[in-house]
């Protein structure tokens, strides 16, 4: 059995630990499984660039819980943006990125693909799975939803959101402490959130709780 991983979309403080948790489970449930990671998300899949996880990773997975980022890289490449994929040299003119990615998964004999990302990442993963099934290749896709916005319905909590709020509150606390050096400072702490107000609200709550 071959298991593949990729991380894609916007960064969030959960990519490394998510991979670590998956390795931990496979080391227990399927120790004989071969684990690979596509480098820099869907870009690596399109270009056929991957790395094989050494057997030692199955015993040393806990180190991934200590770091942010992604050990296999990340990108925002979208298989549905054909023009961008062609311009960047990920596929040739006239090629369908979805088909190129699917054929690479077949070539690599991948049985299970774990996609760690947001809506776009996991929607594309589902499209890949459907394409392969239509072409008589059975691939199981497991999507792990991560976003600091915590706006993936119907999930109550997405990966990365809590940590982002916690760190935002710590940052604000440090800045507020600096404000005691002057009586003529105005601090505006802007928190991202797109059309969702979760991160702003949760960051404020975390800061308020730290002051109690």
Question: Model segments located where?
Answer:
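Glycine-rich nucleotide/cofactor/substrate-binding loop typically near the N-terminus or early
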Residues: 32-108
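Short, ordered loop/turn segments at secondary-structure junctions
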Residues: 8-10, 38-44, 76-77, 118-119, ...
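N-terminal phosphate-binding or glycine-rich loops at protein starts, especially the Walker A/P-loop
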Residues: 1-50
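Accessory alpha-helical/coil subdomains and C-terminal extensions
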Residues: 35, 103-104, 108, 112-117, ...
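Short glycine/serine/threonine-rich phosphate/pyrophosphate-binding segments
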Residues: 12-22, 45-46, 96-99, 119-127, ...
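Gly-rich Lys/Arg/Thr-decorated short loops/hinges at beta-loop-alpha junctions or inter-strand turns
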Residues: 3-5, 65-86, 146-156, 181-184
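Active-site-proximal loop->helix
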Residues: 47-51, 151-160
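Short glycine-rich or small-residue beta-strand-to-loop segments that form or flank ligand, phosphate
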Residues: 2-12, 71-73, 111-117, 143, ...
């Amino acid at each position: 059995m071959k298991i593949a991983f990729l991380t894609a979309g916007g960064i969030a403080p959960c990519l490394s630990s998510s991979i670590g948790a998956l390795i931990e489970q496979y080391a227990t449930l399927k120790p004989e499984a071969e684990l690979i990671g596509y480098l820099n998300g869907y870009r690596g899949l399109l270009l056929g660039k991957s790395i094989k996880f050494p057997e030692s990773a199955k015993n040393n997975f806990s180190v991934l819980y200590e770091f942010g980022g992604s050990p296999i890289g990340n990108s925002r490449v979208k298989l549905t943006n054909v023009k961008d994929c062609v311009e960047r040299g990920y596929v040739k003119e006239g090629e369908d990125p979805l088909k190129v990615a699917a054929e690479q998964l077949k070539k690599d004999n991948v049985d299970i693909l774990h996609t760690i990302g947001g809506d776009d990442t996991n929607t594309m993963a589902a499209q890949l799975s459907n394409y392969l099934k239509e072409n008589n290749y059975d691939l199981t896709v497991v999507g792990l939803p991560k976003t600091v916005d915590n706006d993936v319905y119907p999930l109550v909590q997405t990966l990365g959101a809590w940590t982002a709020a916690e760190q935002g509150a710590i940052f604000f606390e440090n800045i507020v402490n600096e404000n005691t050096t002057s009586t003529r400072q105005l601090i505006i702490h802007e928190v991202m959130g797109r059309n969702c107000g979760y991160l702003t609200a949760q960051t404020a709550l975390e800061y308020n709780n730290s002051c109690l």
